[in-house]
């Protein structure tokens, strides 16, 4: 069943009018017809099921009949602090991490970031990324949309979080690998924070600051991974240990 995002509150039963963008996709790209079933989500915990009532040039009306609790939302809250990199890589990281079950996404400027987003383009860039994650939610079946901070923070803006948050910073030179972490001694982990550097990695001073904020330095083996590979590998590993892959 095809899924569509609707940015407004939904009750069940009710009638809704899809956005112009969603209406165009339904009618002109997918070429769905009146009376075909569809599923709608709006960012809450539910999927709303209905049928297409009418299709006009720029407006599609859906008759919502029932709702069900979404079973694809992530079980644990994983936040990704991702150093700014190229547009294509950031798009892929946000898309794939949404599919894998990320809950929160934050872009950070680090000393070795070789890409910068001009101030006058930040709002449009973040709006584009929000569309990327919504599309990934449509594809993957989840209904909760990952939060995206409305600004890009500097490394010094990273705040110390509560003690019950498991925090990792990836460092190829770290003495401890992910496989050596004594996870059997960690209980009731529901919040995880991942700090991923740019192509050139974090500087020593940044790693020291992160360690003081409670981040454990770890590596992912002998091979040096690209920033987009490292982000998705860590997210997958966390879900294997604590989340949706268990």
Where are the predicted features?
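Glycine/charged-rich beta-loop-alpha catalytic/anionic-binding loops adjacent to active sites
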Residues: 16-18, 75-79, 190-193, 212-220
């Amino acid at each position: 069943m095809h899924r569509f995002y609707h940015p407004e509150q939904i009750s069940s039963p009710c009638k809704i009018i899809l956005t112009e963008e969603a209406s165009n996709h339904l009618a002109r790209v997918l070429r769905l017809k009146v009376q075909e079933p569809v599923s709608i989500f709006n960012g809450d915990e539910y999927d709303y099921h209905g049928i297409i009532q009418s299709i006009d040039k720029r407006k599609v009306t859906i008759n919502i009949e029932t709702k069900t609790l979404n079973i694809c939302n992530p079980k644990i809250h994983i936040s990704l602090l991702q150093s700014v990199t190229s547009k294509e890589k950031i798009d892929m990281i946000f898309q794939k991490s949404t599919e894998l079950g990320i809950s929160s996404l934050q872009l950070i400027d680090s000393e070795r970031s070789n890409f910068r987003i001009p101030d006058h383009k930040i709002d449009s860039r973040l709006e584009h990324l929000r569309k990327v994650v919504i599309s990934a939610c449509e594809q993957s079946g989840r209904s909760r949309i990952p939060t995206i901070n409305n600004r890009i923070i500097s490394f010094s803006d990273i705040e110390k979080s509560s003690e019950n948050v498991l925090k990792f910073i990836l460092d190829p030179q770290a003495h401890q690998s992910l496989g050596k972490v004594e996870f059997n001694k960690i209980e009731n982990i529901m919040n995880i924070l991942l700090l991923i550097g740019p192509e050139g990695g974090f500087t020593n001073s940044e790693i020291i600051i992160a360690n003081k904020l409670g981040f454990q330095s770890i590596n992912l083996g002998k091979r040096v991974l690209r920033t987009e590979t490292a982000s998705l590998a860590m997210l997958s590993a966390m879900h294997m240990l604590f989340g949706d892959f268990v």
